[in-house]
Regions:
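Extracytoplasmic beta-strand/coil segments of soluble accessory domains associated
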Residues: 92, 109-143
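N-terminal periplasmic accessory domains that precede
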Residues: 108-111, 126-128, 175-197, 210
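Gram-negative outer-membrane beta-barrel transporters
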Residues: 451-456, 563-573, 589-677
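Surface-exposed extracellular loop regions of Gram-negative outer-membrane beta-barrel proteins
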Residues: 353, 410, 466-468, 478, ...
Length: 754
């Protein structure tokens, strides 16, 4: 298969340019009305269905005026009755632009916190309590470029957000927990000139930021240009205690570690959308982006040995500096043909660089220098992909879609290490690595309305992956794997039109290692113990993690936006990716590994309703409630608590939002709970994380239609973060406990429209 990869690229490129020639030579004709889509409920027009992720929402100016009027009437009529969450066969929640802007949020992450089944933890978006690669994050159907931060994305530039709970063939099946697809606006009805200024102070961190948006149209061109920038300073104390016991339980080690870190960071970015409306309903869109960052950090640490022999490095001081840039561009060409057929072509390129350097010195208890270490870590990260899909309603009652996706990503890091150690020989090494991932995928899917209240979805996606790693002291390592993902989803509505319905989904998904996870770079720990080992970023032999899943849900929808759902899911995982600590070559090393089979089970309850549904004369307050219980176990790790690392076992959110009539004042708050406890990550290791409770509040005041102020409080309960790590074997155990103090976070922003 991989011997044909160059042919696949050539064929894809030929198809792209062949269609371009056809588009230039064929006369422009108004597109014919498409046949009804099976994903569209009975009695509705095809325009009721949501637009494609990358399709420009603009009428064709070459179409006759009378046709424009009819189209406008159809769209307006459908908007009042179509609900993607209730009507789509695929399990999908669509958050419209109106809902995104309803509460005046200035960051997409604030919008995400209100969405059913979504949790946000440390700026990471999670579904089913799983992040770290299990939840797929897409921008216009593509993975965001390296260095891109979603929290810098202005909600005003977002057309809608899709929460796809079960995988579909159209998108990559690298979505074990699900997919979050953020779709950007391609057309602006009015010109926009926005400026947002923000200030934020949190636990050991203070920042100032700004972002702006300029959007307008000129003839058949619609464009938007956005930018962001910011700077921050941080400084936080840290305390850790280490206790060691022998096989009989007698304490043989006790030490107390304290440290202070302080520094700062600066970042800046530009992103834009250029969308052309072409003849015959065609469109062409480009999304160039550029971002850059830099940071600096200084640290001082000291370890006091209460019991046990001191090492040569109880005192250390160091600095760490870094910078990076990334450039990317997405090109999207949509061509429409007769009878509703459509070809969608995408080309995506990204080029990124990172440069980090660190310098540290360590001293004995007598303040004699014992170690000096200097490390340089330059890296390059490049990606290119080309994808296409063809859809046609050629068969009545069916919506057929087929396509391909080819891609190449390459990561080339280097490590230059100079270490002078009084207890060992001087180290002066240069290590160069290269990791490459090639992907080839084909897919097809069909949606079918079997009856007026029953629809089904069939999909099949095949993805082949080849990884290649090489570098200093490392043999060339190649891994080839492929995943065939049959997918099935069905929706059945109760015939009494009560708003009740049932869903079922069967999926085959996977999580593939990225180029960063394949490069075995090692960052050396000064102390180097079983609880503070060297960190190896990657493993050249890492295999993809495969998952077979079943989802079932009962949903009930009422008028005025009230809804309730109960859902359950099971995921059976093989070649589960985790991290393990090993004693290799005289040093403790923590690295990623494949750790056998695992199973994850989840049950979730979600509800939201406006108070006016129950009390019509009540103030406009919206309530939302979500609780999720996640169970998991890893077969290769003995219990108890042998669950998936970083999965939240129990989480719950209760929130309310108030919007004054006219929208002058918007306010709200939420209480969030996330359980913690012990998790056994390997045969010899246990981690502990404290349960987290958080209260968050905000108020938005619209002084004028063009000026609004937003104030936000987070971490109101000021709960400290307590973590622990334990390593044990036949000789005894060592436990490291740490405490990070916490404080209330305060933020304020001013949004100005020109």
């Amino acid at each position: 298969m991989y011997a044909l990869r160059h042919a696949a690229f050539a064929l894809a490129a030929a198809a792209f340019f062949a269609v371009a020639v056809h588009a230039q030579t064929a006369p422009a004709e108004p597109p014919a009305a498409p046949a009804p889509s099976p994903a569209t409920p009975a009695g509705k027009t095809p325009t009721d269905a949501p637009s494609d992720a990358s399709e420009t929402q603009a009428s064709d100016k070459d179409t006759k005026k009378s046709t424009q009027v009819v189209d406008k009437i159809e769209v307006n009529a459908s908007q009042s009755t179509y609900d993607a969450r209730q009507d789509d066969t695929a399990t999908k929640i669509v958050v419209t632009s109106e809902e995104i802007k309803k509460y005046g949020d200035t960051q997409i992450l604030d919008v995400m916190k209100r969405l059913p089944g979504v949790t946000v933890q440390n700026n990471s978006i999670r579904l089913r309590g799983l992040g770290n690669g299990y939840t797929q994050i897409l921008i216009d159907g593509d993975r965001p470029p390296p260095g891109f931060s979603i929290d810098n994305l202005s909600p005003d530039l977002v057309d809608k957000i899709e929460i796809i709970r079960a995988a579909t063939a159209e998108f990559s099946t690298q979505a074990v927990a699900g997919t979050v697809n953020i779709i950007m606006k391609k057309k602006f009805s009015v010109s926009k000139r926005d400026l947002n200024l923000g200030w934020y102070s949190g636990t050991g961190y203070t920042s100032k930021n700004l972002n702006f948006t300029v959007a307008d149209s000129a003839g058949k061109l619609a464009y938007s240009i956005g930018g962001y920038g910011g700077a921050g300073t941080f400084g936080s104390p840290f305390r850790g205690d280490t206790i060691g016991v022998d096989a009989t339980g007698v304490k043989i080690l006790e030490r107390v570690s304290t440290s202070v870190n302080d520094g700062g960071n600066q970042y800046v970015g530009l992103y834009s959308t250029l969308a052309w409306t072409l003849g015959g309903g065609d469109s062409f869109t480009m999304n160039p982006s550029l971002n850059a960052y830099r940071y600096n950090n200084k640290s001082n640490s000291r370890t006091i040995y209460v019991l046990g022999e001191s090492t040569l490095y109880p005192i250390s001081a160091g600095r760490n500096n870094g910078q990076g840039t990334n450039f990317g561009n997405n090109a999207n060409w949509i061509l429409k043909f007769k009878e509703g057929a459509k070809l969608d072509l995408k080309l995506n390129v990204n080029f990124g660089t990172r440069d980090n350097d660190s310098f540290s010195k360590s001293f004995s208890v007598d303040n004699v220098q014992t170690l000096e270490r200097k490390t340089l870590d330059p890296s390059k990260d490049n990606r290119v992909s080309f994808a296409g899909k063809y859809s046609t309603p050629i068969v009545e009652g069916h919506a057929l879609l087929a396509g391909w996706d080819v891609g190449l990503s390459r990561n080339a890091p280097s490590t230059i290490l100079l270490e002078t150690n009084v207890a060992a020989a001087t180290i002066n090494t240069t290590e160069d690595y290269t990791a490459r991932v090639q992907k080839l995928a084909f897919f097809a899917q069909d949606e079918w309305n079997v009856m007026s209240n029953w629809s089904v979805y069939f999909g099949l996606r095949w993805e082949g992956i080849e990884t290649r790693s090489s570098g200093t002291g490392l043999d060339v390592t190649k891994n080839r794997s492929s995943v065939a993902s049959p997918l099935f989803q069905t929706l059945w509505k109760f015939p009494d039109k009560s708003g009740r319905q049932l869903r079922l989904a069967l999926t085959r998904t996977y999580k593939a290692p990225d180029t960063y996870s394949l490069v075995p770079r090692v960052y050396r720990s000064t102390v180097n113990t079983s609880t503070a080992p060297d960190s190896q970023t990657g493993n050249a032999s890492l295999k993809p993690e495969l998952a077979t899943g079943v989802d079932i849900a009962y949903e009930h929808f009422w008028e005025k936006g009230a809804s309730m759902s109960i859902s359950g899911s099971v995921r059976s995982l093989s070649d589960y990716n985790s991290r393990g600590t090993f004693f290799i070559g005289g040093r403790w090393v923590n690295k990623p590994i494949n750790n056998g089979r695992a199973t994850s089970r989840s049950i979730e309850f979600d509800a939201k309703f406006p108070l006016q549904v129950v009390l019509p004369q009540a103030p406009p307050i919206d309530f939302r409630f979500n609780i999720a219980r996640n169970f998991s176990n890893v077969e290769e790790v003995p219990g108890p608590n042998n669950r998936l690392d970083q999965q939240t076992p129990l989480s719950g959110t209760f929130g309310m939002d108030y919007r004054m009539r006219g929208g002058m004042i918007v306010a709200g708050g939420s209480f969030t709970f996330k359980s913690g406890g012990d998790v056994r990550t390997s045969i010899n290791q246990i981690r502990y994380a404290t349960p987290k409770r958080d209260v968050e509040m905000y108020v938005l005041y619209k002084y004028t239609p063009k000026l609004q102020v937003r104030v936000r409080l987070a971490n109101v309960l000021r709960q400290d973060t307590v973590t622990a790590s334990t390593y044990f074997d036949a000789a005894g155990s060592t436990r490291f406990n740490s405490i990070n103090p916490s404080q209330m976070n305060i933020g304020a922003s001013v949004e100005i429209k020109f």
